[in-house]
């Protein structure tokens, strides 16, 4: 399958992936509008992976990892970057073939390129999630993570959800043959050429400065406590509200990540904070599952 989009631009590559997975049958949803560390934290993955209701979603997700910032000086380390996420439940038997089809569409002939699936089981302690997985290496560079979810929020995933996560910047750097993410051609149209650096370099410099030097530590500690308290209250209601509670959990997790960037948390404290977030996520997962069960798992009736 070919595409009408120019995959030699970052923009065109994303549009091509959206087109490809839409044709497979995925619903293309929009990025989650809060700070998350990975596409997995989007509710369409983290919560929809629970319970028996089938799903098929694909989306771009901006991801923030404050400790990964390098003041815009490192050619491939960013505190804000993009993932393309595909989640299908139950995971189709041919999901690897579908993935390889997406690489072909981007111009990679599997007979001409070294494409390897390297076993790499995945775990997210704060989500209480883990899965069997593989890294996909393209000519020696990791470009994708494959995961078959086994648990989220400590609950078993039945049936198993298949997740494909593309590292968009890495994949684009390979396609375009550049050594610095800032040299990527983001778009190239009638109004001229725009690079990734044009769009994001100043943001990397300033956000790194904020994350490491100026984020208010006292405020972040208080914010964590407040978000934790709100999440607990929402889950303790007679009719719990798992979706708003989950948003509070994500806010708490981002506050923790910012404290980590500020080096405000010791190694032992760090583990305690992770366990606190994990406990909240477990509560959200149980409440979400119960809410769908109370509705009779309506997605199963389609």
Swiss-Prot record:
GO function terms (MF aspect): ATP binding; glycine-tRNA ligase activity
Q: Which CDD domains does the record match to this protein?
A: GlyRS_alpha_core
Query: Which is one Gene Ontology cellular component term of this protein?
Result: cytosol
Reactions mediated catalytically: tRNA(Gly) + glycine + ATP = glycyl-tRNA(Gly) + AMP + diphosphate
- Specify the signal sequence span: none
Among PANTHER family, the record links this protein to: GLYCINE--TRNA LIGASE, CHLOROPLASTIC_MITOCHONDRIAL 2, GLYCYL-TRNA SYNTHETASE
HAMAP family the record matches: Gly_tRNA_synth_alpha
Q: Please identify the protein, giving its name as recorded.
A: Glycine--tRNA ligase alpha subunit
* Annotated organism of origin: Haemophilus ducreyi (strain 35000HP / ATCC 700724)
């Amino acid at each position: 399958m070919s595409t009408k989009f120019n995959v030699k631009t970052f923009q065109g590559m994303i549009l091509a992936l959206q087109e490809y997975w839409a044709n497979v049958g995925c619903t293309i949803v929009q990025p989650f509008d809060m700070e998350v560390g990975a596409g997995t934290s989007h509710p369409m993955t983290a919560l929809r992976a629970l319970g028996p209701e089938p799903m098929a979603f694909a989306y771009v997700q901006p991801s923030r990892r404050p400790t990964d910032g390098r003041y815009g000086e490192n050619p491939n380390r960013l505190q804000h970057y993009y993932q393309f996420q595909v989640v299908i439940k139950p995971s189709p038997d041919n999901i690897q073939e579908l993935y390889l089809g997406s690489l072909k569409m981007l111009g990679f002939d599997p007979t001409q390129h070294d494409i390897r699936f390297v076993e790499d089981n995945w775990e997210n302690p704060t989500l209480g999630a883990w899965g069997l997985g593989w890294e996909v290496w393209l000519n020696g560079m990791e470009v994708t993570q494959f995961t078959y979810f086994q648990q989220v929020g400590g609950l078993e995933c039945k049936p198993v959800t298949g997740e494909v996560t593309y590292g968009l910047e890495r994949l684009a750097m390979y396609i375009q043959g550049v050594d610095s993410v800032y040299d990527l051609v983001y778009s190239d149209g009638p109004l001229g050429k725009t690079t990734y650096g044009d769009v994001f370099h100043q943001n990397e410099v300033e956000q790194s400065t904020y994350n490491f030097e100026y984020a208010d530590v006292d405020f972040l500690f208080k914010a964590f406590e407040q978000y934790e308290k709100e999440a607990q209250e929402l889950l303790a209601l007679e009719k719990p509200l798992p979706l708003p509670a989950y948003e509070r959990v994500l806010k708490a997790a981002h506050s923790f990540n910012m404290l980590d960037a500020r080096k405000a948390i010791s190694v032992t404290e760090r583990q305690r904070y992770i366990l606190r977030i994990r406990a909240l996520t477990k509560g959200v997962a149980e409440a979400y599952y119960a809410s769908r069960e109370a509705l009779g798992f309506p997605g199963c009736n389609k």
